[in-house]
Design a protein with these regions (language model features):
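Short alpha-helical scaffolding segments that buttress acidic/His motifs in well-ordered protein cores
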Residues: 35, 140, 189-194, 225, ...
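Basic, amphipathic alpha-helical segments enriched in Lys/Arg and hydrophobic/aromatic residues
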Residues: 213-254
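Phosphate-backbone recognition surface of nucleic-acid-processing proteins
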Residues: 134, 139-214, 218, 253-254
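Short, solvent-exposed helix-loop connector elements
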Residues: 43-55, 79, 83, 174-177, ...
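Long, charge-rich intrinsically disordered scaffolds of nucleic-acid metabolism proteins
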Residues: 1-125
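Short, conserved catalytic/metal-binding motifs centered on acidic residues
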Residues: 7, 28, 32, 64, ...
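Short helix-capping/linker segments at secondary-structure and domain boundaries
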Residues: 39-44, 145-149, 196-203, 230-245
């Protein structure tokens, strides 16, 4: 036998589709057996150790950065109110400690990537795409090397940047919207990179302007740029070729 990691939301929706509302160990075992038989999910392979370690470092950095921002917001509030000096001093000390630890983790991340030829190569390929910066590049590296995506479309669907259409019948007819499943933190980084790309990346700017001229809402055009970034990231890792506007057309085109 082999192990497969099923999406818990999808497996639960599968159970509801079978008319199973009860949730016990015995019922779950039966439902998962039916799910595996009918869906034949992919075999799960653990990521390489260097990918797992990089992912752990990135998650730790994000947690520390969030804590540092919250502490700095508290400090701003304390400075604008009648707060005792000891409290302000404690808050300033804690904010500085958190910032120092963020810097320490970032140094570890850079050293880890530099020490691994495979990570260094993949990182160079990803950041060869204009508007893919260090943070997006490292996070996309972890996602794309942790999952065996068969296509760029599958990677985009995993990250929740594909449109969902509801046009069946009249009662459910609505505008297409982004699915927004998957990791929201990475989707936020894609959004910021898309905003940067529509200004500084000529190809992305042309895509954005063309969609706006066709009457598409601006947010729809931004979503298309986010999707395009995922396709390009998948393409450079799939081919092992540094990104350029002329090459890789068969893999990078959407």
């Amino acid at each position: 036998f082999y192990v497969s990691l099923a999406n818990p939301h999808r497996s639960r929706e599968f159970a509801r589709g079978m008319g199973i509302m009860t949730k016990t160990d015995k019922v779950d075992a039966y439902m998962l057996a039916c799910y595996a038989f009918l869906k034949n999910p992919h075999r799960w392979e653990p990521p390489a150790p260097e990918i797992r370690y990089l992912g752990a470092l990135l998650r730790r950095r994000d947690v520390l950065l969030g804590d540092a921002l919250r502490e700095e917001n508290r400090l701003e509030k304390y400075l604008s109110t009648d707060t005792p000096a000891d409290i302000i001093s404690s808050c300033m000390h804690m904010a500085q400690l958190l910032r120092d630890e963020v810097s320490n983790i970032e140094r570890q991340i850079k050293a880890h990537i530099k020490a691994s030829p495979a990570l260094r190569r993949d990182y160079t390929l990803l950041t060869s795409i204009k508007s893919v910066g260090p943070q997006l590049g490292m996070h996309m590296l972890v996602v794309l090397r942790s999952h065996d995506f068969s296509s760029a479309e599958q990677a985009a669907a995993f990250l929740g940047v594909v449109p969902i259409e509801k046009r069946s019948g009249t009662s459910v007819r609505s505008r297409p919207r982004m699915s927004k499943i998957g990791p929201p933190q990475l989707r936020a980084k894609l959004y910021m990179s898309a905003l940067c790309g529509k200004i500084y990346n000529k190809r992305m700017r042309n895509i954005y302007d063309e969609m706006c001229l066709r009457g598409k809402p601006k947010m729809v055009a931004i979503g298309a740029l986010m999707r395009k970034l995922v396709h390009w990231c998948y393409g450079v890792l799939k081919t092992g070729i540094v990104f350029n506007d002329e090459g890789l057309k068969q893999v990078l085109s959407t």
